[in-house]
Amino acid sequence: MTQSQQVSADPAPLRTPADYQAQLDEKRERLCGLFADFTLPALEVHASPAEHYRMRAEFRIWHDGDDLYHCMYAPATKEIIRVDQFPTASRLINQLMPVLLEGLRPHPVLRRKLFQIDYLSTQSGQICVSLLYHRKLESEWQQAAEALQADLRAKGFELQLIGRAHKQKICLGEEFVIERLTVQGRQLVYKQVENSFTQPNAAINEQMLGWALDVTKGSEGDLLELYCGNGNFSIALAQNFRKVLATEIAKPSVDSAQFNIAANGVDNLIILRMSAEEFTMAMRGEREFNRLKGVDLGAYQCNTIFVDPPRAGLDDATVKLVQDYDNILYISCNPETLQANMAVLGETHEIARFALFDQFPWTHHMEAGVYLKRKAG
């Protein structure tokens, strides 16, 4: 991104607590309206911090001669906006942003064809920074980047620095950070890997985990989770169940989940690297898988299933699979697809608990949670 393009200063909006409450009330009304055709319990609303809530941020880089700045595109106009501070992002990201640019400016080898910087921060104080380039990274870059990382660490940042280019990734330390979340008074440890999915709002993540624990309190039998990622939910929920089975297909996520199981001393959770479709075939005895050697599926009585699908929601086949379970815990990042899935799930199950999580304040997006129980008779 070059100086020939127009760049505007970031006009940070002045927002008050009343403004935050107003946007939260609008989401509450919209969510209740979306589910007006269902018999609903009282909606449980979980508010976010109004600023410094986002643990991840990505910025394009604008070059002006020997200088450079973070910038973003305005959603409506696509205008390039210079960003010196970003109140949406964590305080740690905001602290590092100017210091990192200060470290990059004197070094052409670090600046040249740098087009994006990604930040992954934690509440624990650790942060991972990825520098993305439109060129191959040579040994000269690595030497300069190692010096930059050492300088930033000397300034008090518990930082991991990564360089990325086409088909190239150079990790100068680790490619992950360790997050610590407090859930119902208990501290949970999570390995979060660069460039893989993690919950963006740590405060809301803690509230979602606490809510999931509360709604499944006193559960009988075992839990099945489909596509568990790094074990974010299954590790927290394991204390409420005799045993937990979780599936995940991405190897980096499975590796992180195994690390997190050990780090949290969980001894009743098994992660299976397989798809929901494969697991269904195995559970019904339709096919055998080498990956299940040593796992006795017959020893599990999964009365409860947990799903946290992408924005598209559950496909028709998975909805039918989920209906087989007495209790369904469903976290949705798109209540419209949750509503569509509920058109089917509502035939057999009723909504026992209903929650709104303000994962993305100041945006249209909402996160919703429902706990469904099989209808009597």
Swiss-Prot record:
<feature type="binding site">
    <location>
        <position position="308"/>
    </location>
    <ligand>
        <name>S-adenosyl-L-methionine</name>
    </ligand>
</feature>
<feature type="binding site">
    <location>
        <position position="232"/>
    </location>
    <ligand>
        <name>S-adenosyl-L-methionine</name>
    </ligand>
</feature>
<dbReference type="InterPro" id="IPR030390">
    <property type="entry name" value="MeTrfase_TrmA_AS"/>
</dbReference>
<dbReference type="InterPro" id="IPR029063">
    <property type="entry name" value="SAM-dependent_MTases_sf"/>
</dbReference>
<protein>
    <recommendedName>
        <fullName>tRNA/tmRNA (uracil-C(5))-methyltransferase</fullName>
        <ecNumber>2.1.1.-</ecNumber>
        <ecNumber>2.1.1.35</ecNumber>
    </recommendedName>
</protein>
<dbReference type="GO" id="GO:0030488">
    <property type="term" value="P:tRNA methylation"/>
</dbReference>
<feature type="active site" description="Proton acceptor">
    <location>
        <position position="367"/>
    </location>
</feature>
<keyword id="KW-0808">Transferase</keyword>
<feature type="binding site">
    <location>
        <position position="199"/>
    </location>
    <ligand>
        <name>S-adenosyl-L-methionine</name>
    </ligand>
</feature>
<dbReference type="GO" id="GO:0030697">
    <property type="term" value="F:tRNA (uracil(54)-C5)-methyltransferase activity, S-adenosyl methionine-dependent"/>
</dbReference>
<keyword id="KW-0949">S-adenosyl-L-methionine</keyword>
<dbReference type="InterPro" id="IPR011869">
    <property type="entry name" value="TrmA_MeTrfase"/>
</dbReference>
<feature type="active site" description="Nucleophile">
    <location>
        <position position="333"/>
    </location>
</feature>
<comment type="function">
    <text>Dual-specificity methyltransferase that catalyzes the formation of 5-methyluridine at position 54 (m5U54) in all tRNAs, and that of position 341 (m5U341) in tmRNA (transfer-mRNA).</text>
</comment>
<dbReference type="InterPro" id="IPR030391">
    <property type="entry name" value="MeTrfase_TrmA_CS"/>
</dbReference>
<keyword id="KW-0489">Methyltransferase</keyword>
<dbReference type="Pfam" id="PF05958">
    <property type="entry name" value="tRNA_U5-meth_tr"/>
</dbReference>
<comment type="similarity">
    <text>Belongs to the class I-like SAM-binding methyltransferase superfamily. RNA M5U methyltransferase family. TrmA subfamily.</text>
</comment>
<feature type="binding site">
    <location>
        <position position="248"/>
    </location>
    <ligand>
        <name>S-adenosyl-L-methionine</name>
    </ligand>
</feature>
<feature type="binding site">
    <location>
        <position position="227"/>
    </location>
    <ligand>
        <name>S-adenosyl-L-methionine</name>
    </ligand>
</feature>
<keyword id="KW-0819">tRNA processing</keyword>
<dbReference type="GO" id="GO:0000049">
    <property type="term" value="F:tRNA binding"/>
</dbReference>
<dbReference type="InterPro" id="IPR010280">
    <property type="entry name" value="U5_MeTrfase_fam"/>
</dbReference>
<dbReference type="GO" id="GO:0019843">
    <property type="term" value="F:rRNA binding"/>
</dbReference>
<dbReference type="GO" id="GO:0005829">
    <property type="term" value="C:cytosol"/>
</dbReference>
